[in-house]
């Protein structure tokens, strides 16, 4: 019997005689335990919801193609970039960050921008956002961010107080907060926003020469954003507006595109950089490190099944290929373990076998992993009956020394270094970003901030005003006015670290 016949079967192939009526002892009697189809269905239903992502739970995705448009082989020998015109299959997932699976798409929030490239040397995952920076630069704070932006443990409601108490306790968060309160904190849809690798990564070439890089993805649909008022009206009619926009565009053949660029910094330049080049709260200025075009990706195929391809998509920055590498960015280093560990919890130890996660560029038949067994291991015959140890006399599991990476530069002793003693320049870049805004855009930052801080205690509001003022006096004055606070009553000369010391 073929699936096309539409005839109902159980999970193991037996035909189902009655889909609507349970087996009972008599016309009006109780259920019988031998109604195995009912038991099979209800027990499966009880388990069909898998754990949601701790962050980025609400998302949309699509398949597409990446095409190289410019030669960057002087920086990397990664095969994905080996020649102009080369194409690589890929998958992209966009998301909000704070909300749960059922949250509205139009919330003032960061958007996730995760890409999976199926290269011939394995999967390369670039797990980014629609902003080039983040709230902090040490992964030990990540759990607190998650809790602060999600539901309060007592009320089970989102808490602006918790959110802003955390953000304003970290002066380095102002750069990200400024972006979030700007027009770009509410993109019209996933098609109308830029993407960033955010972290500093590295590339190396055939000579073993390493450079530090940042990835940028510029939307070719143009940047479009909503005001808070516009977004509120749309949410009242459609909570899935961004997902619907992406899906419908692809279904209608209006395939969205993004151009990929990199910024490149040499190891010598990094040593002389005025700030820590691996600080996730700061950008590299484009006048010093201009954008270099790399390629373009186009999303041209919607998933056939959302759960199969989008909900079960697993991204981790440890999925990297020869020619590409990490950096000393502490936030990136912290994610190297966390992401894969979360996927093993959410999807199981063999989640690499799920179709969207398979290394399609290599081919499952060509894999030779040392890992075996675990729940639901089936795809590669569990490596068959060959040796499951190394070394062995069959030459299985031999290393590939030709893919050794060049030495990773490090210095110093292992210690819990206070990064604030190394760099307390929290406000220069937020100030420059503010001054780049038009007068109307500045007013919207003030208004958006006031909206977002509704219900927040005055001391937390004052903390934020003080930080804004240190970035630019007009920034602080504008936020104070929008919040209805007399800035002349605020001690603006308080040491910039005082709030953090109190926060600890």
UniProtKB/Swiss-Prot annotation:
Instruction: Please list where the region (Disordered) is annotated.
Output: 1-25
Output the GO biological process annotations, alphabetical, semicolon-separated.
hydrogen peroxide catabolic process; response to hydrogen peroxide
- Where in the sequence is the active site? 56, 129
The record's annotation in SMART domains points to:
Catalase (SM01060)
Iron in keyword set: yes
Q: Where does heme bind?
A: 339
Question: What reaction(s) does this enzyme catalyze?
Answer: 2 H2O2 = O2 + 2 H2O
**Gene3D superfamilies reported for this sequence:** Catalase core domain
**Required cofactor names:** heme
Record's GO cellular component terms: cytoplasm
Question: Per the record's keyword annotation, is Heme included, yes or no?
Answer: yes
Q: Which GO terms describe its molecular function?
A: catalase activity; heme binding; metal ion binding
Q: InterPro entries this protein is in?
A: Catalase, Catalase_3, Catalase_AS, Catalase_clade1/3, Catalase_core, Catalase_haem_BS, Catalase_immune_responsive, Catalase_sf
- What EC number(s) would the UniProt record show? 1.11.1.6
**Top-level EC class, please?**
oxidoreductase
Q: Could you tell me the superkingdom of the organism this chain comes from?
A: Bacteria
Keyword annotations of the record: Heme, Hydrogen peroxide, Iron, Metal-binding, Oxidoreductase, Peroxidase
Against PROSITE patterns, the record matches this protein to: CATALASE_1, CATALASE_2, CATALASE_3
Q: What does this protein do?
A: Decomposes hydrogen peroxide into water and oxygen; serves to protect cells from the toxic effects of hydrogen peroxide.
Assembly and interactions?
Answer: Homodimer.
Family from the record: Belongs to the catalase family.
Name of the molecule in the record = Catalase
Tell me the organism.
Staphylococcus epidermidis (strain ATCC 35984 / DSM 28319 / BCRC 17069 / CCUG 31568 / BM 3577 / RP62A)
Q: Which gene encodes it?
A: katA
